[in-house]
Amino acid sequence: MINSFSLFAHITPIIRSSLHSRYSVISSRKAMSSLAAAPYRHVMMPFSPAQDAQVHGNSALTKLTDAIPDLKIYTRSSPHYESLRGVYNKLITAQPLAICRPTSVAQVQAIVKTVSGLGIPLGVRGGGHDVFGRGCIADSVTIDMRELDTQELSQDKKTVKVGGGITSKNLVGFLGSHNLCTSNGFAGEAGWTSWASWGGYGPLGDYVGLGVDNIVGAKIVTASGDVVDAKGDSELLWALRGGGGNFGVIAETDVRVYPMSTIQAGFIVYPWPETADVLLRLQALLDSGVPDKLCLQAGFTKGEWGLGMAITYIWPEAETIGPESEEWLQKLKGLGTCIVDTVAETTFEAFQASISSAISNPVNVTSRHISISKFTSDTLNQLIGACESMPAEADCSITCTILHGKAAQANVLSAFGTRRPHIMLHINAVTEEAAHEHVAIAWADRLVDGVEATGDSIGSTYVSFMESDKDPKGCYGENWERLKAVKKEVDPNDVFRFVHGRIPAA
């Protein structure tokens, strides 16, 4: 799952486009649609048992097809296999034994029951944007959730019930047709459920909370194949709000939604030599107090214009777009010499689409993250130095998600660990050739090491952006032992072990 990857690596064409259109799609807001979401669904994958489900004498697959005769299962000889297997990060080349596309929760139950008794790995895939490939496990039976992507808005339009395979852009599009939104990232192709349940850092977090804060209920298929409705103050619901798919397949979630007809959003770009001064002034502004509805990110990249730093600005409250939002926008522009300002009234759907279009195609990507308590001279020296040493073999970017509002507030109803103001640095390096991966790794790791050496780091805070071989205990903080107890109760045999921030059963 990937949230803001390469946002600023592709900012030049986005800025150029926005200067012409100013996100004018606001004038074409969809008419109010029904409470169900037929237009905002995945296209059903064609399936022919004769072509797609050849088991080639494999006893495990034979048992699976015998147990679930109507299951859409795609083995390695299927003409659709590679299109289903492929993920966002092209460096992930693992080949599952078979990929299943369930069309009902009952089929998910049957897959889990059957596979857990066969002694072979079980994988679960949402959108396929996890850059570490935890939805594409070698020799596994993989549950591909993408056809379980129903959406239904409640009658009072305060919550939406979504299937576990829903993507961010489809959720945003459906809610946008009702002038609503919820916490989301910028990568429209990312699976919303996994993004949200492991934390859900995103550009609206300070206004509406993290992804985990907006899950109000869930339907989970546990390792035994049973369906559990997690709601209220249940321990399982608390655990999956931060521990995600460690406890089972999240087949459905109930999600809190918010009125959001229009937003004010865009990029503010400053001259590269002013970078440190601008961000230190921004930190002083944050320290003095800013409203939750001022949502900010900062980003660094090298493009056709050379090195650049920009602030992403979003004001998501339509009722206060005007004098109040303009006051804060002018404060941001006054942090330095504003050389580009693309801020305009738009919709979150349009703004997400303008960014997501640049980060949808698969790439060879190396990704790291580290969080800091605030911008300091030492951390900025490391960030600026890393930018000035970006290797020629890689397209590098750093996105800084700034948490100061609701996203940073304590929430005892979730297991997400880091509840304090901080800045999460998402570090990415894309290489045209896979053979240059070592160059990307060296650059990204050097930056992480440099930030840690300043003493300003608070370590890793987001398991979705953490390498699989790293210990996630620090991300969960004081919730670690409680999470282990839940894991031991619902998945004692560690069936769901190929996940973000793995929580051991023992």
From Swiss-Prot:
Disulfide bonds: none
Disruption-associated phenotype: Impairs the production of aurofusarin and leads to the accumulation of a light yellow pigment.
Inducing stimuli: Expression is regulated by the aurofusarin biosynthesis cluster-specific transcription factor aurR1/GIP2.
Keywords linked to the UniProt accession: FAD, Flavoprotein, Oxidoreductase, Secreted
Chain ranges of the FAD-binding PCMH-type domain: 92-260
Protein name: FAD-linked oxidoreductase aurO
Pathway recorded for this protein: Pigment biosynthesis
Organism of this sequence: Gibberella zeae (strain ATCC MYA-4620 / CBS 123657 / FGSC 9075 / NRRL 31084 / PH-1)
Role summary: FAD-linked oxidoreductase; part of the gene cluster that mediates the biosynthesis of aurofusarin, a red mycelium pigment which is acting as a mycotoxin. The first step is performed by the polyketide synthase which condenses one acetyl-CoA and 6 malonyl-CoA units to form the first intermediate, the cyclic heptaketide and yellow pigment YWA1. The C2 hydroxyl group in the pyrone ring of YWA1 is probably formed during ring closure by an aldol-type cyclization reaction.
Cofactors named for this entry: FAD
InterPro entries: BBE (IPR012951), FAD-bd_PCMH (IPR016166), FAD-bd_PCMH-like_sf (IPR036318), FAD-bd_PCMH_sub1 (IPR016167), FAD-bd_PCMH_sub2 (IPR016169), FAD-linked_Oxidoreductase (IPR050416), Oxid_FAD_bind_N (IPR006094)
Family (UniProt): Belongs to the oxygen-dependent FAD-linked oxidoreductase family.
Subcellular locations according to the entry: Secreted; Secreted, Extracellular space
Keyword presence, Secreted: yes
Quaternary assembly: Might be part of an extracellular enzyme complex composed of GIP1, aurF, aurO and aurS.
This protein's GO CC annotations: extracellular region
EC number: 1.-.-.-
GO molecular function, a single term: oxidoreductase activity
Gene: aurO
